[in-house]
Every structure is written in C-alpha cells, then in structure tokens.
From Swiss-Prot:
This is LL-diaminopimelate aminotransferase. Homodimer. Keywords: Aminotransferase, Pyridoxal phosphate, Transferase. One of its GO terms (molecular function) is L,L-diaminopimelate aminotransferase activity. Involved in the synthesis of meso-diaminopimelate (m-DAP or DL-DAP), required for both lysine and peptidoglycan biosynthesis. Catalyzes the direct conversion of tetrahydrodipicolinate to LL-diaminopimelate. It comes from Synechococcus sp. (strain CC9902). It holds the Pfam family Aminotran_1_2. Substrate binds at Y15, G42, K109, Y132, N187, N292, R388. Pathway: Amino-acid biosynthesis; L-lysine biosynthesis via DAP pathway; LL-2,6-diaminopimelate from (S)-tetrahydrodipicolinate (aminotransferase route): step 1/1. One of its GO terms (biological process) is lysine biosynthetic process via diaminopimelate, diaminopimelate-aminotransferase pathway.
C-alpha cells in the first residue's frame, strides 16, 4: 500500500484558520439569524484599486488578439514588473536590489514554505512565539522537527518568546541557529523593528553564517519614516537574508494572487561536501521546475500598483485600514483592555480580560457579540491569554463590532 508523508501526522489538530472556520460554521448553523462580523483572518474587504482593475481589463483585451496574446510567461516574472518592484520598493530606499533578484509568485505564504525546498535538513530553525503558523507547520511538513510537546511546541525548533516585556521583539538567541524567521510589521502582534534591532539580527546572522527569512508582507502599513520597510535597508543583509513581499494586503490582491521573493545574488549556503553554493541559482532552478509563473493579466495589475494613480490608490487603501485599526485601539482601550499593535500594522493584539484563555475569549465574543477574532494561542504557546483583531473590514462593520463588544 502507498505510504503517506508521516510528517503531516505530527501536525496539531488543524491549521488555525480552518479551526476558526469550523467553530464559526457550527455557531452559524445553530444560530442562523446571527449577523456575524469577521475580524479574524487577515483577508481584505475593499475593492481592488481602479488602476489595477483597468490594467487587468486592458490585459484581458490584449489576450483576445493574436499580437497581444501571452501563453506561458517567465517563471521568475515578467521583466517589466520585476524592474518596477526593484526600482520603487528597494532602490528608492537605498537597497542594492536588482530586477533579476526579484522572483514573482502567487503568494508569500507559498514562498515562505517553498523556500525549504532549497535548504538542507539539519538546519537549526528559530521562530518567534507567538508566530505566523505557516513558518512552523511548513517545517513540520518538511520533516525538520520532532513531535509536538504538551504546549504544542515542536522538538527541534528554537522558540524565541515575544511579549509586552520585550515589546514583542525577540532577543538574539543565546544558542547558534541557522534559519531565523522574522516578520515585521509582525503578524500577529503588530510590532515593528527599529533599524538598530534589525542590524543586530543581521550582525548575528553574518557572524553565525545564518540565514534570515524576512517576511515584510505588511511593510506598506508602517507609519513612521524611521522604521525600515525592508531587511535590505540594513548594511550586510544581502549576505544573509531572503525577503518575502506581497500585494495581498496593500493592494487587495488576496483573491487575485501576486507576491514576490527577493533572493540576492551572492547569498550562499553550504553543500554537504562543504562547497559554497549560491541560493539564487537553487531558487531559480526550483521555480523553473515547480512553478509556471503568475498570470500575465495579474502581473499587469500588479505593475499598475507602481503607477502614479496606483500609488495614490494604495495609499488610500492602507490609510482606510489603519483608521479601522485606530478605531479598534481607541474603543478597546476605553474599556480598560491592554492593547498592542495597530499603529504600524492592520492587527490589534489584545490581552484577554479577567484571566480568560484565548479560545475562551474567542467563544465569548462569538456567542455574546457575534464578532469573530483570532485566539492568540493559535499562534503559539506564548500567545495564550492574547487575542488578535484584524482591521480588514468595512468602517460600518468595525464600528458595529466595537459597539457590540462595548455593550458586553
């Protein structure tokens, strides 16, 4: 009989968001009249920017002509999009990133998992706790961990606790590690890292020959001009980092799918025989074999993000969601709750009241206020006693959700 990948059997009961969906579905079946407001999963709600829609319509029309038709595109992405990304997202900030170091994909979630394809077994992996679950689960699936313990932590991973005590920014590990997952602005806590903090990580990685996997999916929400948007704003990062970016949250591409990963040329790892190997070549080979590229139509839409009109519309979208975050912060603070995040990220991180556990607070809000959020314990053991609310919803729904919670 065919054998299964036993690593999947080590995964905890369910990925966080499907478990939320299961509970919400059961509640809705029992309470069909309830008008739920969803502030849980980080899915956007506002329409795509007009500039992107128009660009995609033009691309669709072109596909209907012999001269404008596009079949398989470059697995790495079309040159015109890669050049726009390199110039406007990186070179404009002083980062030495070239277009051929940009790999366009259908999602940073996919890329942050698939990057393990080019990294060998035996690497010591460090993740924050709490953490975006994909970083942990993808390592479990790839056989890079042992079993989960009583608290849900997996053997073989180095957990770096983050809390209010360290401003939700992990301390440099005391033990040597090889792979370091960093996410700033942080999901789920909404914390950001200063230039000095990122420099400390780059210095550590360079001195220990480690690799930083830097998730910058929420960089567009940073409000302080002193806070770096990219790890490559830090000197030396080209020698030790890969960065993941997405159009999902800033431009509303969650349903159209477009993202990119930055792999600098000259970034190297070690083969089993001790030989130094360039990671750019491995990732290029991996993408050429396992990925057929993002749709021409979608890439034209992504390119429009960098137009003058597109930039203005994206800025308006980001401002809208950040105003939602501000409303959530203000209203919950007025209730005496301890609130974090929501200033440079679309997530508000809440200390649950009265010693309530995370899932208990989830059920409380679901049943009493018909509001759906995300239990902090779903992001790791150190997230127990916290709760995440997302600013991704309409202004009407955010205001209504706050009114319901305040009435409890």
């Amino acid at each position: 009989m065919v054998k299964v990948n036993g690593n999947y059997l080590k995964l905890k009961a369910g990925y966080l968001f499907p478990e939320i969906g299961r509970r919400v579905k059961a509640f809705s079946a029992a309470n069909p009249e309830a008008a739920l407001i969803r502030l849980g999963i980080g899915d956007v709600t506002e329409p795509l920017p007009l500039a992107c829609r128009e660009a995609m319509k033009t691309a669709i029309d072109a596909m209907g002509t012999a001269e404008g038709f596009h079949g398989y595109g470059p697995e790495q992405g079309y040159a015109w999009l890669r050049e726009a990304i390199a110039q406007q997202d990186f070179q404009s900030r002083g980062c030495e990133i070239n277009a051929d170091e940009i790999f366009v994909s259908d999602g940073s979630k996919c890329d942050s998992s698939n990057i393990l394809d080019i990294l060998g077994e035996g690497n010591r992996v460090a993740v924050t706790d709490p953490v975006y679950p994909v970083y942990v689960d993808s390592n479990v699936m790839a056989g890079r961990t042992g079993d989960a313990g009583a608290e849900g932590r997996y053997a073989g991973l180095t957990y770096l606790p983050i809390s209010a005590d360290n401003n939700f920014s992990a301390e440099i590990p005391s033990e040597p590690v090889d792979l370091i997952y960093l996410c700033f602005p942080n999901n789920p806590t909404g914390a950001v890292a200063t230039r000095a903090q990122l420099k400390a990580w780059v210095d550590y990685a360079r001195s220990h020959n480690a690799l930083i996997l830097f998730d910058a999916a929420y960089e567009a929400f940073i409000q302080d001009p002193e806070i770096p948007h990219s790890i490559f704003e830090i000197e030396g990062a080209r020698e030790c980092a890969i960065e993941f970016r997405s159009f999902s949250k800033n431009a509303g591409f969650t349903g159209t799918r477009c993202a990119f990963t930055v792999v600098p040329k000259g970034l190297k790892g070690t083969a089993a025989n001790g030989e130094l190997v360039e990671l750019w070549g491995l990732w290029n080979r991996r993408q050429s074999t396992k990925f057929n590229g993002v749709s021409y139509i979608i890439q034209r839409g992504a390119e429009a993000v960098y137009s003058t009109a597109g930039q203005a519309e994206v800025k308006t979208l980001v401002s809208f969601y950040m105003e939602n975050a501000s409303i959530i912060r203000q209203e919950l603070t007025s209730l005496g709750l301890q609130i974090y995040g929501g200033e440079h990220a679309p997530y508000v991180w809440i200390k649950t009241p009265n010693g309530m556990d995370s899932w208990g607070f989830f059920d409380h809000l679901l049943n009493k206020a018909n509001v759906v959020g995300t239990p902090g314990s779903g992001f790791g053991a150190a997230g127990e006693g916290y709760f995440r609310l997302s600013a991704f919803n309409s202004r009407k729904n955010v205001n209504e959700a706050m009114a319901r919670i305040k009435s409890l």
